[in-house]
């Protein structure tokens, strides 16, 4: 059985209910709004975030209407943030499909993103849980702050792992942490259990982001972006940060500063990518992923008793670290 089938096995019916509720949340009778929401609904991914929420609820109790509305609220918040991110990044594509701003325009994208965000707040209010409502509100602030922090880190000449992890913890890791935490909260898990679930989600998110960053050092049609795309956008990720710090190569450090100032050529990016590969950057990033994987496994061994849920969460963890796209 493949990873995704294992992940879905304990929550198959719950996931179908989530998809139905999520799709209904993105329906509207207005002509233009209906068109844009249909466009967004068609680009559904693997449902990794809602599956984590459902699995955590199943682990600590049961999947309830509180769980489902919380899952829809969180996924809508994430969807709204992606619509807005595409405007900020002037991106023309999202998951192999034309972005909302490219298909329509920036005004429509911003307004529809706001509409989806409001719908997210509506759904999470149906949970009638002050803790979950507060958590989602805090997540929205954290994700926005993470984007601003990343913009600031690009213009800042300092290059360090600390800054790299600080950005991740307010972006990808924060999202996965919230999924695990909200799933546990929806099943009335104890404070200790919720904290442990959040840490598991954070580890998952860090692994997910490091894997994404490693992809950027290789060409892949499946991934849908060329080698060095992050550097083109002014971002220095873990593999190159390690290679620079471990060698102290001043010539390469000059190129790294050109990445941050957006003055680097494609030929120089190719040099920096090759330098990273030759100096253990990929191997180091891979090792760090497995360090976080080991910590995440401690959560499974301590807090997950149901064998099907254990297998599903382990498959989830293994999928994130071993995925090819």
Labelled PLM ranges:
Residues 1-325:
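All-alpha prenyltransferase/terpene-synthase fold signal
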